[in-house]
C-alpha cells in the first residue's frame, strides 16, 4: 500500500480548504465575522465528539433470540444488519465498491483533495452540491452520522446537508478515521454500515435479501449490483426499477473492467447475466410479533433484560445472541394442552401457563404460552398484553389457601393439626360481605359442600373447605398471609400502584391495600394474579424454600463473542427447607382420592407423586391449578379477559349465565395434559422428606386435653399452655351430660399462642359418622350385595356401595 501523504502537505491542503470554506461561509452566512470564533469553537467540539463516536461506537446490528435447542425464536432490530469480518466478505464485493466509489482508495489518506476543493470552489460560485470527491472514508462518516448518530429528523437532515461546514467536519473525521484504522478495516466497516435498500443494511444482509446467500459467496455480477445500489437505493431498487438497476450494475462492471484488466474476461461475461435477484426480497421477520406461540415468552425475555439494565433499544441495536431457557419439548405440549381446553378462537376467555424448572441457583422458565395469539388484530382475538406474566383476571381462588397454611406452619403449626370446619364462619374486623345473610360489618364464609367438622391440614388442602381456612387466617393474621404470598413468589403484589384496579385514585400496592383493610378474603384468592409468579411460587416450594426470579436467560453473548452478565434479583431462602418440603407433602393428595384434581389426574393417566392445589373465584370468572414435583413447577390460569367479565362455564369452556368453572375442571385438565408427556424427562420424580417440626408442630402447638374439667379449670390449663382462650364457650352435640366440658376447638395441634374455644356439651348425642373412605382414596366399602342373572352366564354378585359424599369444589 502506498505511503501516506506527508503530514505537512496534508496540513497545508486542509488549511487551504479551510481558508476557502471560511471565506465562503463568512460571505454567505455570517456578515459579521465577530461571531466566527464562537462558531469555530463549537464546531471543534462537534467534530471531536463525532470522531469519538465514529471510532469507538458500534453500528446497530440484529439481535437473535434462540431457544434451549438453538432454534430461532425472534430477530430483534432497528436496522437489519449482521456485521461480518473482512474474511467473510467476498473480494468481488470489495473490488466492486472501491472501483465505483473510490478508485484511489488505496492511495489517499482519507480525503481526495482535488475533488474536495473542486466541490468547495463550486459552492463558492453558486453550485450548492459539495459532494465532489467523497472518499469511502468520507462516505463512511456521512453514513455513520445519518444511520447511527442522528436520532431526530433534524439531526438526520444535518447529517446530509450540502454545506461547507458539514463537508469540513466530514474531512476532519475522515482524516482521523484513516489515521486510526487500516484500509482493510475501513473497507470492512463501510461495507457493514451502508444501506443497500429494502431495509437491508450492511453487505451480509444485502446478500441474503437479494440473493439468499452469504456475503462471502457473492459473484461478480451480484457484487456489482450491490455496489451500484449504494448511489441511490430507492431509484436503483431492482424490484421497482430492474432496468435502471441492471444498467447501473453494468456501469460498475465497466469500471471494474477498466480498473481490473486481469479480470476483464470474467467481468464481461458477468455483464451478460440477468439481475438474478430473488423473486421477492428475503426480508427477516422483526420482533416478537413473528415468534408464533413463543411470542409471549419473547416479550418476557425483553422485559427481564430491561429489569437487568439492558433496554429494548440496546437489544434492538446491540447484535446480541440471546440464548434462552425455552425448551421446545416442553413448550409444544403446553401449547397443545392449552388450546385443547381453551380454543384460540374463544372470545373473551384466556388460558395461560408457564413451566419453571426448580433450583437453588436459578428458576429457569421452560415454557410459556397462551391460547391467545400475540398480535394487533383485536377482532381476531389477538393481544399484545403480557397476559402470562402480568396481573390479570379475578384471582386464583382457593390456591391462596397455600399462603395461609404456609404462614401458619411458619408460626409453629404442624400439618397434623386438626382444622375446624364449621358449616359457616363469621368474624368482624376481617372485611365485610361474603355469604348470604351476613350481618353488617361482618365477613361471612360458607362451604360449597358438606364436610366433616374437622380434618387435618393435608385433607383440608385436598378437599378445600372454605371455612377451615377462613378461621385459620383469622388466627394467622391477614398481614402474615400476604407477606408469605409475596415471599414465596407473588412479588407484583408489593409494587406501588398495583391496587389501582380496586382503588383508581391510590398508588397503593395490592399488599398494602389488603393489609390496610385486613381482608380475610385474601385466603380465598379474590384478587388479580400474575400466573408466571404463581408458577414460581410452586418452584420456590419445589426448591426447598429458595426463591429465585423466573429466569428466561441461559446466556447473553455480545457481538464480539463475550458473555454479558444478566442480573436482576438474587436467589433467597425465603422459608425454611423443612417448611417447604412438608407443605409439598401436605399438598400431595389433591390429585388422588377425594382431592379436587383427582378426576383430571386420572383422566390423563397421571401416576406420579406431585403436589397441587385447585382454585376458583366465587363468581367463577377465573380459576386455576398450580402443581409441582421436584423436577418442574407450573400453573394454569383461566380467566375472562373481556372488558365486561362474566361467569364462565366448563365442558366446553364458555361464557354463561351461572358459572360452574372450577380449578378441578379445565385448569387442572390442562396442567396434567401438558405435563404428562414430559413428566419423566428431567429425572426421578419424588416427594421431598418431611420435617417433624412442621408435621407435629413446634413446641407449644399441642392443645392440652380439658375434657371433664370445669370451665374455669379448663381456661387455666389452656392459658398455662400458652394459648389464648375465647370469651365465649361453644355448645356442641355430645353424649356427655349437659354443660360438661368435652373438648376444644381447635384440638390436637394448632398455632402456638392462638385462640382456643372451649366446647360444652348440649346433651344431644351426635349423628353416626358416614362410612370411612379407604386409605387409598377409593370408593367406600360395600354395604350389601345384589345377584344379577344373565342368560348363559353363572350368577354374578355385585357389591352395593354407599353413595360417597359429593366432591366439594375448591
Each predicted region: which residue ranges?
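Short pre-catalytic segments that frame enzyme active sites
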Residues: 71-82, 205-209, 234-238, 312-318, ...
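N-terminal type II signal-anchor transmembrane helix
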Residues: 1-64
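Ligand-recognition elements built from short beta-strands and adjacent flexible loops
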Residues: 677-810
Amino acid at each position: 500500500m502506498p505511503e501516506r501523504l506527508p503530514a505537512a502537505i496534508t496540513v497545508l491542503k486542509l488549511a487551504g480548504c479551510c481558508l476557502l470554506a471560511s471565506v465562503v461561509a463568512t460571505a454567505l452566512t455570517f456578515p459579521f465575522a465577530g461571531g466566527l470564533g464562537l462558531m469555530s469553537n463549537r464546531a471543534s467540539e462537534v467534530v471531536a465528539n463525532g470522531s469519538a463516536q465514529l471510532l469507538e461506537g458500534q453500528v446497530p446490528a440484529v439481535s437473535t433470540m434462540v431457544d434451549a435447542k438453538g432454534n430461532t425464536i425472534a430477530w430483534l432490530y432497528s436496522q437489519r444488519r449482521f456485521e461480518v469480518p473482512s474474511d467473510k466478505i467476498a473480494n468481488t464485493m470489495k473490488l466492486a465498491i472501491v472501483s465505483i466509489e473510490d478508485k484511489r482508495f488505496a492511495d489517499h489518506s482519507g480525503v481526495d483533495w482535488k475533488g474536495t476543493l473542486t466541490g468547495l470552489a463550486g459552492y463558492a460560485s453558486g453550485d450548492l452540491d459539495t459532494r465532489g470527491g467523497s472518499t469511502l472514508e468520507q462516505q463512511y462518516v456521512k453514513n455513520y452520522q445519518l444511520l447511527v448518530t442522528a436520532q431526530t429528523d433534524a439531526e438526520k437532515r444535518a447529517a446530509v446537508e450540502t454545506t461547507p461546514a458539514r463537508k469540513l467536519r466530514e474531512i476532519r473525521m475522515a482524516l482521523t478515521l484513516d489515521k486510526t484504522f487500516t484500509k482493510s478495516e475501513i473497507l470492512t466497516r463501510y461495507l457493514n454500515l451502508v444501506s443497500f435498500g429494502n431495509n437491508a443494511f450492511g453487505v451480509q444482509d444485502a446478500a441474503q435479501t437479494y440473493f439468499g446467500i452469504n456475503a462471502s459467496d457473492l459473484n461478480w455480477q451480484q457484487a456489482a449490483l450491490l455496489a451500484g445500489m449504494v448511489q441511490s437505493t430507492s431509484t436503483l431498487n431492482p424490484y421497482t426499477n430492474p432496468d435502471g438497476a441492471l444498467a447501473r450494475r453494468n456501469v460498475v462492471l465497466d469500471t471494474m473492467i477498466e480498473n481490473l484488466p486481469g479480470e476483464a474476461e470474467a467481468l464481461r461475461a458477468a455483464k451478460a447475466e440477468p439481475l438474478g435477484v430473488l423473486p421477492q426480497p428475503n426480508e427477516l421477520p422483526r420482533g416478537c410479533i413473528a415468534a408464533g406461540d413463543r411470542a409471549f415468552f419473547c416479550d418476557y425475555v425483553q422485559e427481564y433484560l430491561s429489569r437487568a439494565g439492558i433496554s429494548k433499544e440496546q437489544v434492538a441495536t446491540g447484535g446480541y445472541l440471546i440464548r434462552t431457557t425455552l425448551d421446545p419439548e416442553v413448550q409444544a405440549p403446553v401449547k397443545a394442552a392449552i388450546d385443547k381446553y381453551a380454543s384460540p378462537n374463544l372470545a373473551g376467555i384466556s388460558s395461560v401457563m408457564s413451566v419453571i424448572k426448580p433450583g437453588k441457583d436459578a428458576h429457569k422458565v421452560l415454557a410459556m404460552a397462551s391460547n391467545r395469539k400475540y398480535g394487533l388484530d383485536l377482532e381476531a382475538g389477538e393481544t399484545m398484553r403480557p397476559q402470562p406474566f402480568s396481573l390479570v383476571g379475578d384471582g386464583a381462588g382457593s390456591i391462596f389457601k397455600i399462603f395461609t397454611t404456609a404462614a401458619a406452619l411458619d408460626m409453629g403449626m404442624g400439618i397434623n393439626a386438626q382444622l375446624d370446619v364449621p358449616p359457616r364462619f363469621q368474624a368482624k374486623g376481617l372485611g365485610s360481605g361474603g355469604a348470604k345473610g351476613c350481618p353488617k360489618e361482618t365477613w361471612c364464609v360458607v362451604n360449597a359442600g358438606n364436610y366433616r367438622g374437622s380434618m387435618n391440614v393435608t385433607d383440608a388442602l385436598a378437599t378445600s373447605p372454605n371455612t377451615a381456612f377462613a378461621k385459620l387466617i383469622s388466627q394467622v393474621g391477614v398481614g402474615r398471609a400476604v407477606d408469605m404470598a409475596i415471599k414465596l413468589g407473588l412479588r407484583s403484589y408489593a409494587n406501588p400502584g398495583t391496587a389501582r384496579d380496586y382503588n383508581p385514585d391510590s398508588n397503593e400496592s395490592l399488599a398494602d391495600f389488603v393489609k390496610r383493610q385486613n381482608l380475610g378474603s385474601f385466603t380465598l384468592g379474590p384478587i388479580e394474579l400474575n400466573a408466571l409468579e404463581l408458577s414460581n411460587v410452586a418452584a420456590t416450594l419445589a426448591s426447598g424454600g429458595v426463591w429465585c426470579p423466573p429466569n428466561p436467560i441461559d446466556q447473553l453473548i455480545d457481538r464480539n463473542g463475550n458473555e454479558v452478565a444478566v442480573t436482576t434479583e438474587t436467589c433467597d431462602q425465603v422459608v425454611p427447607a423443612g417448611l417447604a418440603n412438608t407443605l409439598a407433602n401436605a399438598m400431595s393428595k389433591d390429585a388422588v382420592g377425594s382431592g379436587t384434581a383427582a378426576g383430571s389426574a386420572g383422566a390423563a393417566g397421571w401416576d406420579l407423586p406431585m403436589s397441587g392445589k385447585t382454585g376458583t373465584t366465587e363468581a367463577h370468572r377465573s380459576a386455576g391449578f398450580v402443581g409441582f414435583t421436584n423436577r418442574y413447577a407450573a400453573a394454569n390460569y383461566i380467566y375472562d379477559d373481556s372488558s365486561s367479565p362474566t361467569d364462565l362455564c366448563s365442558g366446553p369452556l364458555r361464557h354463561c349465565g351461572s358459572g360452574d368453572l372450577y380449578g378441578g375442571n379445565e385448569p387442572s385438565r390442562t396442567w396434567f395434559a401438558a405435563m404428562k408427556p414430559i413428566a419423566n424427562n428431567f429425572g426421578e420424580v419424588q416427594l421431598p422428606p418431611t420435617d417433624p417440626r412442621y408435621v407435629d408442630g413446634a413446641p407449644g402447638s399441642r392443645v392440652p386435653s380439658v375434657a371433664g374439667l370445669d370451665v374455669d379449670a379448663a381456661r387455666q390449663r389452656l392459658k398455662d399452655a400458652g394459648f389464648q382462650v375465647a370469651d365465649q364457650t361453644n355448645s356442641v352435640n355430645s353424649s356427655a351430660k349437659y354443660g360438661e366440658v368435652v373438648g376444644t376447638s381447635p384440638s390436637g395441634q394448632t398455632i402456638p399462642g392462638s385462640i382456643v374455644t372451649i366446647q360444652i356439651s348440649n346433651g344431644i348425642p351426635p349423628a353416626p359418622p358416614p362410612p370411612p373412605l379407604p386409605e387409598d382414596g377409593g370408593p367406600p366399602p360395600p354395604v350389601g350385595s345384589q345377584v344379577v342373572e344373565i342368560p348363559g352366564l353363572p350368577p354374578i354378585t355385585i357389591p352395593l356401595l354407599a353413595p360417597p359424599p359429593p366432591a366439594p369444589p375448591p
